[in-house]
C-alpha cells in the first residue's frame, strides 16, 4: 500500500467523508475514492502475497493480479480477483467526472474584440500517449512532451492572432494515440508504441485541451471546444469531450460541443466551417456530403472551408466551392512513420475569418 493510499484510508476509517478528505488533501474526490478502494483491496489480500509484493516493489495491488512466489521448498501460485475491465473503466471515468470541479475562469484580459472576426485553432493528430525514441525516429516524443507542445503551440497562436470575438478549438481526431489499455488501433489491431498507462494519458489529454481553451478564453469573448473522433481514439475521445463539458458546465465563456456524430459544421456570417478526421472519405465525397446534409448553410454562405487530418502532411485543394485543407499533425513521427520515410513536420495554426470576407489572417507555429 502506498503512503497516499494509507493516508486516505486512515482518514476515511476515522469517519471523514471522501469529499471532505479531498478538500483537506487538495485532491479530486475521484482520486481519493481510488486510493481508498485500492487500500481496501490491498488489506483484503493474503498476508503472504502482501509480503511477496512488497519485496519486489509492487505494493499497489492494481499492478499485479497473479504470479509465482518462490520459496526455499516450493513455488506457490497466487491469483487475485480481477475486476471486470469494462465496468472498472466506466466507473473510473464516472468518478473522474463527479470529482472534477467546475472552473471559475479569471476575467478576460481587457481590450476590445472584433465581433466580425472568428479564429479557429485546430489541433490535428496530437497522439497523446505515443512514445518515440529519438535515436530511432529523429525526435523524442511522449505524454509530457505532447502536453507541453500543445500548451506552447496554442499559446503562441493565441498571442499572435487578432482579438476576434469568437474562437473555436478543434481537436481534429487522434488526440489520443491509443483507445484503451490494449495499445492497439481499434479497427486494424496494429500494435502501438505507447507511453505510460491509458488512464494517465486520458487525464493528460483532458488537461491539454482544457489548457488550450483557457488560454483562448483570456483573449476571446467566446470559446467553443470541439473534440472529434479519430481512428486511434474511436471511443476514448468521448471521455475527453464529456469531461470537458462537465468542467465548463457553468461557464458562459467556454462551450464544449456535445453532439453525436463525426462531423463539425458551423456557420459564421457568409463563412461555412466544417471538419472531420479524414479517415473515412476523400475530399470530393466530404464536400458532396456537406452540401447534401446542410443545404441551408451551404446556400447562405459564400466562403466554405473544410479541415481534415489523419495523414499528417499538408495538402490544400479547391473542391466544388470548398477549400479543403488537410492539416499537418501536432505529433512527432513514430517508429512506423520513420521506417516508411514519412517526413512531414509538426505544426500549429490559427486561422481568422471575417464574417463577410472569409479568411483574413493565418498564424503558423512550426515545431
Name these PLM-found stretches:
Residues 2-144, 148-151, 162-163:
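Acidic, histidine-bearing metal-coordination/catalytic regions of metal-dependent phosphoesterases
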Residues 16, 188, 365-366:
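Peripheral, non-catalytic segments of secretory and membrane proteins
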Residues 58-69, 210-227, 274, 304-309:
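N-terminal short leaders/motifs
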Residues 107-108, 113-126, 134, 139-254:
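Core catalytic region of metal-dependent phosphoesterases/phosphodiesterases
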Residues 217, 243-255, 259-262, 267-367:
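Conserved beta-sheet core of the metallophosphoesterase superfamily
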Amino acid at each position: 500500500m502506498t503512503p497516499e493510499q494509507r493516508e486516505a484510508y486512515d482518514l476515511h476509517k476515522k469517519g471523514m467523508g471522501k469529499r471532505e478528505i479531498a478538500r483537506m488533501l487538495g485532491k479530486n474526490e475521484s482520486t481519493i475514492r481510488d486510493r481508498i478502494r485500492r487500500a481496501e483491496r490491498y488489506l483484503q489480500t493474503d498476508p503472504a502475497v502482501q509480503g511477496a509484493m512488497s519485496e519486489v516493489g509492487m505494493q499497489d495491488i492494481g499492478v499485479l493480479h497473479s504470479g509465482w512466489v518462490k520459496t526455499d521448498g516450493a513455488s506457490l501460485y497466487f491469483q487475485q480477483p480481477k475486476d471486470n475491465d469494462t465496468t472498472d473503466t466506466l466507473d473510473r471515468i464516472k468518478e473522474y467526472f463527479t470529482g472534477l470541479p467546475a472552473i471559475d475562469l479569471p476575467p478576460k484580459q481587457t481590450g476590445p474584440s472584433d465581433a466580425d472576426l472568428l479564429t479557429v485553432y485546430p489541433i490535428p493528430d496530437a497522439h497523446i500517449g505515443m512514445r518515440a525514441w529519438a535515436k530511432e525516429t529523429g525526435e523524442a516524443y511522449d505524454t509530457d512532451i505532447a502536453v507541453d507542445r500543445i500548451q506552447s503551440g496554442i499559446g503562441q497562436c493565441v498571442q499572435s492572432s487578432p482579438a476576434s470575438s469568437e474562437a473555436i478549438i478543434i481537436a481534429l481526431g487522434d488526440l489520443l494515440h491509443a483507445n484503451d489499455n490494449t495499445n492497439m488501433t481499434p479497427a486494424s489491431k496494429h500494435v502501438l508504441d505507447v507511453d505510460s498507462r491509458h488512464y494517465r494519458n486520458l487525464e493528460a489529454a483532458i488537461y491539454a485541451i482544457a489548457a488550450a481553451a483557457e488560454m483562448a478564453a483570456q483573449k476571446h469573448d467566446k470559446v467553443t471546444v470541439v473534440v472529434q473522433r479519430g481512428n486511434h481514439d474511436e471511443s476514448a475521445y468521448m471521455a475527453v469531450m464529456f469531461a470537458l463539458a462537465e468542467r465548463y458546465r457553468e461557464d458562459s465563456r467556454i462551450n464544449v460541443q456535445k453532439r453525436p456524430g463525426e462531423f463539425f459544421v458551423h456557420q459564421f456570417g457568409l463563412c461555412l466551417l466544417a471538419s472531420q478526421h479524414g479517415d473515412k472519405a476523400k475530399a470530393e465525397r466530404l464536400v458532396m456530403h456537406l452540401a447534401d446534409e446542410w443545404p441551408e448553410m451551404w446556400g447562405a454562405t459564400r466562403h466554405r472551408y473544410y479541415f481534415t487530418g489523419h495523414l499528417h502532411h499538408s495538402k490544400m485543394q479547391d473542391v466544388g466551392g470548398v477549400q479543403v485543407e488537410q492539416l499537418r499533425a501536432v505529433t512527432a513521427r513514430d517508429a512506423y512513420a520513420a521506417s516508411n520515410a514519412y517526413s512531414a513536420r509538426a505544426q500549429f495554426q490559427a486561422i481568422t475569418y471575417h464574417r463577410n470576407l472569409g479568411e483574413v489572417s493565418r498564424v503558423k507555429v512550426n515545431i
